[in-house]
């Protein structure tokens, strides 16, 4: 089994500094939502986000959405060999039950995340997604069972993933949940190993897919009759 943690994910509610901006208020009105309870989305709020620190990398719930679809629909998850977690830029930790079916429709996913921020868990009766607040990256890692922490970074040492995963049982893989720049959390000091799997930067869902398929092949080979 392995775990994946999407760190410093750009998933947050609209910051109070920009709730009064026209782009934010207009979109919230169309959706019959309070601006302050709306998910920040660069595709909708880009004009207002110029006023935010690091505004050019924030408001990317789509990255979380695609990552979760790739991970939770993987064969590795279906055979019970994967656990998935999200850490946000504001130090929330989101734990996702492996049986969760993430909406493929993006607006529905955004609505689900807005409910999660408001209620702390969804669905209400039998929660499958749970948020904990005030969890920095170290606290998140401390709550996830693991034997080794592996950070994926373009600056890491190059490895052949098909060979590398053979020594990764019970490992925690950390991937960046942002579109550009560096980790804002001190992830490097938490990692036992920092690796790269390609000569160029890759999207997080591509990296996740490569890890999932290679580890799945390792599991299948290990369980095959000799």
From Swiss-Prot:
Protein name: Ribosomal RNA small subunit methyltransferase Nep1
Keyword presence, Iron: no
The protein's enzyme class: transferase
Encoding gene per record: nep1
UniProt function note: Methyltransferase involved in ribosomal biogenesis. Specifically catalyzes the N1-methylation of the pseudouridine corresponding to position 914 in M.jannaschii 16S rRNA.
EC id: 2.1.1.-
GO molecular function terms noted in the UniProt entry: rRNA (pseudouridine) methyltransferase activity; rRNA binding
Keyword Iron-sulfur carried by entry: no
Keywords: Methyltransferase, Ribosome biogenesis, RNA-binding, rRNA processing, rRNA-binding, S-adenosyl-L-methionine, Transferase
């Amino acid at each position: 089994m392995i775990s994946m943690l999407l760190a410093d994910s750009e998933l947050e509610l609209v910051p109070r500094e920009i709730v009064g901006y026209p782009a934010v208020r207009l979109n919230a009105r169309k959706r019959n939502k309070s601006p302050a309870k709306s998910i920040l989305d660069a595709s909708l709020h880009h004009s207002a986000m110029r006023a935010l620190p690091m505004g050019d990398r924030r408001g990317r719930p789509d990255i979380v959405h695609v990552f979760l679809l790739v991970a939770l629909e993987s064969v590795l998850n279906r055979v019970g060999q994967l656990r998935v977690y999200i850490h946000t830029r504001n130090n929330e930790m989101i734990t996702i039950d492996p049986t969760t079916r993430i909406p493929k429709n993006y607006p529905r996913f955004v609505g689900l995340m807005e409910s999660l921020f408001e209620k702390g868990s969804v669905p209400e009766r039998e929660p499958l997604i749970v948020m904990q607040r005030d969890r920095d990256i170290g606290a998140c890692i401390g709550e996830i069972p693991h034997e080794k922490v592996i950070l994926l970074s373009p600056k890491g040492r190059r490895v052949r993933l098909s060979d590398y995963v053979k020594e990764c049982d019970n490992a925690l893989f950390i991937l960046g949940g942002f579109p550009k720049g560096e980790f804002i959390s001190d992830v490097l000091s938490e990692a036992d190993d920092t690796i790269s799997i390609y000569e160029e930067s890759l999207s997080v869902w591509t990296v996740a897919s490569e890890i999932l398929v290679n580890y799945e092949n390792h599991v299948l080979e290990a369980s095959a009759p000799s």
